[in-house]
Amino acid sequence: ADGTQFLGTEAFDFEESGIDILGASAYKWLLAGYGNGFYLVKDGVMDQFDLKGIGNGSVNNDASKRNSITFCKFLEPGHLDSLNFGSLEFAINFLDEIGLENVQAQLEKLSKRALTAFSELDLLEPAITKRKQHSTIFNIKGNEKLFNKLTKENIVASPRGGGIRLSFHFYNTEEEIDVIATLLKRWSSK
């Protein structure tokens, strides 16, 4: 399973989950920067793999150890990026300090506020407006002209599939969503 779109949004216990292998890029909700990711593999599925490839670092520069290394050593690249490991550790500690229950609560507030605001402005697909719960990623109706206006106002957005993606994380505020909604309303009335 891909945890990129989930990890960092609420508490998650890999061992208690029904997932055997989880991979994730850590740049998104985990806030650990680009080029950072990991895999989690449950002990019970490791014997289903016959991994052959190793890097020099996997065997600590001694190829004679190739048959005695642990499962995870087969998954290591040739050169490990200790700076990225430190960034990931810092990000995980930062989120732990805030508390993932607080992150989740803030995301729920932001999602409700954005869902209401964008629905009232008729900027969402009908299927989205009917949802009781939605993520904090919204694809609003809009063209390149609207995208450029948002960008000019220092609002981070991305053109996506004929619309404009707006995403919010715990560090965003409901007031920021209100500002965006006010601008969108003003621009639509012109």
Predicted segments — roles?
Residues 17-60:
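Active-site PLP attachment segment
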Residues 68-71, 83-126:
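Conserved PLP-dependent catalytic core of the aminotransferase class-I/II
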Residues 1-21:
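Catalytic PLP-binding core of fold-type I/II PLP enzymes
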Residues 44-82:
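Acidic donor-binding loop at a coil-to-helix junction in glycosyltransferase catalytic cores
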Residues 108-153, 168:
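Conserved PLP-binding catalytic core of the aspartate aminotransferase-like
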Residues 9-10, 31-36, 168-171:
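Short, charged, surface-exposed secondary-structure boundary motifs
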Residues 149-190:
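PLP-dependent enzyme catalytic core of the Aspartate aminotransferase-like
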